[in-house]
C-alpha cells in the first residue's frame, strides 16, 4: 500500500467520509510497509487493500460485513467474501453463500466467486480488518483497521439514506449499536462458515429480505444476479 493521499486511493465520496481517520489510514500504510521491510507479506495485494472504498459512497444501499481477508494466498481481493474469478475450489463460506443465494433467489449457481458485480451495484463488501498475514487468520486484528472501518460504517448511517446491513455471525452483530443511529435495518444470521451455516444461515434468505426492506424504505432493489 503506497504512501499517497486518501483522495488518490479511494472514491471522492469515501475520501470525504474517511477524512476523520485519514491519519489512521496513513499509519496503517506505514504498518504494512514495515511488515514488508521485515520480510513479512500481507493480503490482499497493496492496490486492493482499500478496494471496497473505490465504489461510490453515495450509492451504497447494502452492507455485508466480513471479519478479515481470506488468509489463503491468491484468495483475498479486497472485497469481503469475494475471490478472483480463477479461484477453484471456492472457500467454503463463499460456497455456502452461493448455496443460499440459489435457494433464496432461484438463480443458477454463479460461474465463479467474483462478487465485483455486487460492489458495482451498491453493495459494500467490507471486512472489519482490511489485511491479514498469509496463512495466519486474524493476524492483523487489533493493529488499527477497526477504527477505519467503523468510521466508514458511521459515515454510511449518517447519510440518512436507506441502508440494509447483512450481519453474518457474532462479530458482525457487534456493529448493531452503530447501525442503529441511522436509517438502517439489520438482517442477522449465523455466519456462512461450515462451522455455523447449518445453525440458521441456510434458509435465512438474506438477499430477498434485503430487497424487500429496501423497497419498503423507498429505495431501488439490488440486482443480485451473478454470471
Curated annotation (Swiss-Prot):
User: Which cellular compartments is it found in?
Assistant: Cytoplasm
Enzyme class per UniProt: hydrolase
Major location (coarse): cytoplasm
InterPro entries per the UniProt record, alphabetical: UDG_fam1, Ura-DNA_Glyclase_AS, Uracil-DNA_glycosylase-like, Uracil-DNA_glycosylase-like_sf
In this protein, the active site sits at 68 (proton acceptor)
* Keyword terms of this UniProt record: Cytoplasm, DNA damage, DNA repair, Hydrolase
| Xref: SUPFAM superfamilies | Uracil-DNA glycosylase-like (SSF52141)
GO MF annotations in UniProt: uracil DNA N-glycosylase activity
Membrane-spanning regions, if any?
A: none
Cite the Pfam families for this sequence: UDG (PF03167)
EC code: 3.2.2.27
Question: Which domain of life does the UniProt lineage start with?
Answer: Bacteria
Q: Which GO terms describe its biological process?
A: base-excision repair, AP site formation via deaminated base removal
Give a GO cellular-component term: cytoplasm
Q: Does the keyword Cytoplasm apply?
A: yes
What does it do?
Excises uracil residues from the DNA which can arise as a result of misincorporation of dUMP residues by DNA polymerase or due to deamination of cytosine.
Family to which this protein belongs: Belongs to the uracil-DNA glycosylase (UDG) superfamily. UNG family.
Protein name per the record: Uracil-DNA glycosylase
Q: Which organism is it from?
A: Mycobacterium avium (strain 104)
Q: What is this organism's lineage? A: Bacteria, Bacillati, Actinomycetota, Actinomycetes, Mycobacteriales
Amino acid at each position: 500500500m503506497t504512501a499517497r493521499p486518501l483522495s488518490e486511493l479511494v472514491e471522492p465520496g469515501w475520501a470525504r467520509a474517511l477524512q476523520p481517520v485519514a491519519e489512521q489510514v496513513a499509519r496503517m500504510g506505514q504498518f504494512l510497509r514495515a511488515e514488508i521491510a521485515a520480510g513479512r507479506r500481507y493480503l490482499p495485494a497493496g492496490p486492493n487493500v482499500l478496494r471496497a472504498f473505490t465504489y461510490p459512497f453515495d450509492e451504497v444501499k447494502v452492507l455485508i460485513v466480513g471479519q478479515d481477508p481470506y488468509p489463503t494466498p491468491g484468495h483475498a481481493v479486497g472485497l469481503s467474501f469475494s475471490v478472483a474469478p480463477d479461484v477453484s475450489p471456492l472457500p467454503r463460506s463463499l460456497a455456502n453463500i452461493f448455496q443460499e443465494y440459489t435457494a433464496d433467489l432461484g438463480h443458477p449457481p454463479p460461474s465463479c466467486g467474483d462478487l465485483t458485480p455486487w460492489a458495482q451495484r451498491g453493495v459494500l463488501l467490507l471486512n472489519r480488518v482490511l489485511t491479514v498475514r498469509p496463512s495466519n487468520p486474524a493476524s492483523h486484528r487489533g493493529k488499527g483497521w477497526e477504527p477505519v472501518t467503523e468510521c466508514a460504517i458511521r459515515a454510511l448511517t449518517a447519510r440518512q439514506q436507506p441502508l440494509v446491513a447483512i450481519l453474518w455471525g457474532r462479530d458482525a452483530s457487534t456493529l448493531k449499536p452503530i447501525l442503529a443511529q441511522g436509517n438502517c435495518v439489520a438482517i442477522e444470521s449465523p455466519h456462512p462458515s461450515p462451522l455455523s451455516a447449518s445453525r440458521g444461515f441456510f434458509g435465512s434468505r438474506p438477499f430477498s429480505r434485503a430487497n424487500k426492506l429496501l423497497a419498503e424504505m423507498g429505495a431501488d432493489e439490488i440486482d443480485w444476479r451473478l454470471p
